[in-house]
UniProtKB/Swiss-Prot annotation:
It catalyses: a beta-D-Gal-(1->4)-beta-D-Glc-(1<->1)-Cer(d18:1(4E)) + CMP-N-acetyl-beta-neuraminate = a ganglioside GM3 (d18:1(4E)) + CMP + H(+); ganglioside GA2 (d18:1(4E)/18:0) + CMP-N-acetyl-beta-neuraminate = ganglioside GM2 (d18:1(4E)/18:0) + CMP + H(+); a beta-D-Gal-(1<->1')-ceramide + CMP-N-acetyl-beta-neuraminate = N-acetyl-alpha-neuraminosyl-(2->3)-beta-D-galactosyl-(1<->1')-ceramide + CMP + H(+); ganglioside GA1 (d18:1(4E)/18:0) + CMP-N-acetyl-beta-neuraminate = ganglioside GM1 (d18:1(4E)/18:0) + CMP + H(+). This is Lactosylceramide alpha-2,3-sialyltransferase. Disulfide bonds join C194-C352. Mainly expressed in brain, and then testis, heart and liver, almost all tissues showed some levels of the gene expression. (Microbial infection) Gangliosides GD1b and GT1b (derived from GM3) may serve as receptors for some C.botulinum neurotoxins (minimally types BoNT/A, B, C). The keyword Transferase applies. The chain crosses the membrane at residues 66-86. The gene is St3gal5. One of its GO terms (biological process) is lipid metabolic process.
């Protein structure tokens, strides 16, 4: 017992001494202890290595995340472009080419009736002011004027509702334009009749061209062609109202005395307009920011260019149609941007004493009828567009018709 105790006591200090004497990372008295010590010894260095690796990986992970987000954004953008350019494969073109003869006679007779009535000075804007009260500015300038300081209303919102952060670019554009008002020969006319010619397929076959040419001011929208369709839509053009992606690509759609009224939606639109006024080529990198091909040239002299007053768009959207004001969004639209057609209708009430419409109206219950008078795109494509509230706009136009503010020559608004 004593020997064992002494032996045990003698061996225990020896074991402790050997552990104490040995360097911490070298003591290997047993397999278990060895493994444990190696684990303890390596933990600190492993933690340091892991932290270092994480630091080294952060930039590469960040780059990967950016690449992923870019690819996702590009994919969504591509899908958006495909939707915008969606065209139904089967469109009932027979409906476009056949029009009831009685309907043709009624449309032509009604157009002549409107033209033969005595013109009523200031009728349209007075009626708009009575209908919408303070939501319609009766004395609003239709085009942006060259003044020392832009109005507060012009600078309140971003394009297309205003020119906030773009005032210097607007002034630079105005410096290039020798004229900013409605042409003198039109302003001097005691009473002017406007017709806003929409792009609707309902125009095809009505043979309203002769009647439309008799209006004092004919407003056409975007790239809607005249060549080859003059029997139905006329060939007189006083104003071509559009934005870069909507401008005609063919020179034959521009006439020497046209007014080219531009709606500016985004930053690159200013660059495009500047290039068109100066008859310069648009840099390739700028073209990448448009969602479709834009015109390389607008064959008109600088005196024929105008910039639409953005307050007209603002009043049309937020005051008359009562859309919500723009909110900051990562992607998409709030459907608070009026169509060029409805904006043109409001513009016409500021320019002319009486206003008529032709080629307006979306019959969404007939998805396979032609959407435009000049192509095979179908009405069903309107279900895919994401920027405009067609239902609200139709109610607005119906209200104008009911109150007698405008006339519908083609009978498409219902």
């Amino acid at each position: 017992m004593h020997t064992e105790a002494v032996g045990g006591a003698a061996r225990r200090p020896q074991k402790l001494r050997s552990q104490a004497a040995a360097p911490a990372c070298r003591a290997m008295p047993s397999e278990f202890t060895s493994a444990k010590l190696r684990s303890d010894c390596s933990r600190t260095s492993l933690q340091w290595y892991t932290r270092t690796q994480h630091k080294m990986r952060r930039p590469s992970l960040l780059i990967k995340d950016i690449c992923k987000c870019t690819l996702v954004a590009f994919g969504v953008w591509l899908l958006y472009i495909l939707i915008l350019n969606y065209t139904a494969e089967e469109c009932d073109m027979k409906r476009m080419h056949y029009v009831d003869p009685d309907r043709i006679k009624r449309a032509q007779s009604y157009a002549q009736e409107v033209l033969q009535k005595e013109c009523r000075p200031r009728y349209a804007k007075t009626a708009m002011a009575l209908l919408f009260e303070d939501r319609y500015s009766i004395n609003l300038e239709p085009f942006v004027q060259k003044v020392p300081t832009a109005s507060e209303a012009e600078l309140k919102y971003d394009p297309p509702f205003g020119f906030r952060k773009f005032s210097s670019k607007v002034q630079s554009l105005l410096d290039m334009l020798p004229e900013h008002d409605f042409p003198e020969h039109l302003r001097a006319k005691a009473c002017k009749r406007c017709v806003v010619v929409g792009n609707g397929g309902i125009l095809h076959g009505l043979e309203l061209g002769h009647a439309l040419n008799q209006f004092d001011v004919v407003i056409r929208l975007n790239s809607a062609p005249v060549e080859g369709y003059s029997e139905h839509v006329g060939n007189k053009t006083t104003i071509r109202m559009t934005y870069p992606e909507g401008a005609p690509l063919s020179d034959v759609e521009y006439y020497a005395n046209d007014l080219f009224v531009t709606v500016l939606f985004k930053s690159v639109d200013f660059k495009w307009l500047q290039a068109m006024v100066k008859n310069e080529s648009l840099p390739f990198w700028v073209r990448l920011f448009f969602w479709k091909q834009v015109a390389e040239k607008v064959p008109l002299q600088p005196k024929h260019f105008r910039i639409l007053n953005p307050v007209i768009i603002k009043e049309t959207a937020f005051d008359i149609l009562q859309y919500s004001e723009p909110q900051s969004r990562f992607w998409g639209h709030d459907k608070n941007i009026p169509t060029i057609g409805v904006i043109a209708v409001v513009l016409a009430t500021h320019l002319c004493d009486e206003v008529s419409l032709a080629g307006f109206g979306y019959d969404l219950s007939q998805p396979r009828t032609p959407l435009h008078y000049f192509d095979s795109q179908c009405m069903g494509a309107m279900h895919w567009q994401v920027m405009h509230n067609v239902t609200t706009e139709t109610k607005f136009l119906l209200k104008l018709l009911k109150e007698g503010v405008v006339e519908d020559l083609s009978g498409g608004i219902h």
